């Protein structure tokens, strides 16, 4: 009985040590956790020049789901970055204004955790979310709405005007940049902390045995060389390095 109890204690201690070792292995491999603590998360995603507030987030959410910011009045941000479909569109190539397929055969990247991206769009041409939000709204194959049209429509809706005043003050100028920046503020809140992040933060019980084995293999096989950082976002990598890209229609 004493031997069995001692063995159980030994195995438990060994298991805890292995988990702690795996946490260290993961973090030293470059994997980073999304903070589950709201204060730590806000410190990471907030902008002192345009602080996140409840009013801005709620207003940005309405704009995100509003098709009136597209030329046709049919397409919203959520049309392509569907929050119920992983923040993406789930099709081989995005479909935009006039049922136009993306000319570069690209689908929509997820909006979830995009606040952690060092650059936006597949090619990284945009430095941050507020800048990125301006692109699809105006792009011909996407929402096809000139900035002036978006401004006219939003300013013609009294409820929106009042909400902008509530979010930014009574003297706010509701222009295109302010509209898209407000959408970006909502997008900043679309983060998905998980049990994987809890594990990286030091909770060795957050993952089960099979998940830990998978993480260990993920690191040992070199997957973490590219898929690293926070939310496994990785870094910008050269395209077609191994082989020529072939479109699968």
Where are these regions (language model features)?
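Positively charged n-region of N-terminal signal peptides that target proteins for export
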Residues: 1-6
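Generic hydrophobic/packing signal
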Residues: 14, 115, 133-137, 154, ...
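Second-shell loop/turn segments in exported
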Residues: 46-49, 66, 138-139, 148-151, ...
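C-terminal capping alpha-helices of c-type cytochrome domains
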Residues: 147-194
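Generic hydrophobic, aliphatic-rich segments that mediate packing or membrane embedding
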Residues: 73-76, 107, 125, 146, ...
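Accessory helical subdomains and C-terminal extensions of nucleic-acid helicases
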Residues: 142-143
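Short glycine/threonine-rich turn/loop motifs
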Residues: 22-135, 197-249
């Amino acid at each position: 009985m004493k031997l069995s109890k001692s063995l159980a204690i030994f195995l438990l201690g060994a298991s805890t040590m292995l988990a702690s070792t795996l946490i260290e292995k993961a973090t030293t491999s470059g994997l980073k956790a999304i903070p589950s603590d709201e204060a730590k998360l806000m410190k990471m995603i907030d902008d002192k020049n345009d602080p996140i507030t409840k009013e801005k987030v709620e207003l940005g959410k309405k704009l995100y789901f509003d098709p009136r910011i597209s030329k046709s009045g049919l397409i919203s941000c959520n049309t392509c970055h569907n929050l119920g479909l992983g923040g993406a569109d789930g099709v081989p190539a995005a479909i935009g204004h006039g049922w136009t397929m993306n000319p570069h055969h690209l689908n929509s990247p997820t909006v979830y955790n995009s606040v952690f991206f060092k650059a936006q769009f597949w090619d990284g041409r945009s430095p941050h979310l507020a800048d990125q939000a301006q692109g699809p709204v105006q792009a011909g194959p996407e929402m096809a709405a000139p900035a002036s049209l978006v401004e006219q429509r939003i300013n013609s809706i009294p409820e929106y005007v009042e909400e902008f005043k509530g979010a930014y003050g009574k003297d706010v100028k509701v222009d295109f940049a302010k509209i898209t920046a407000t959408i970006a503020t909502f997008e900043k809140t679309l983060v998905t902390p998980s049990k994987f992040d809890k594990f990286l933060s030091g909770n060795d019980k957050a993952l089960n045995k099979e998940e830990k084995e998978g993480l260990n293999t993920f690191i040992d096989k070199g997957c973490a060389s590219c898929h690293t950082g926070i939310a496994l976002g990785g870094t910008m990598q050269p395209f077609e390095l191994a082989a020529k890209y072939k479109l699968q229609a």
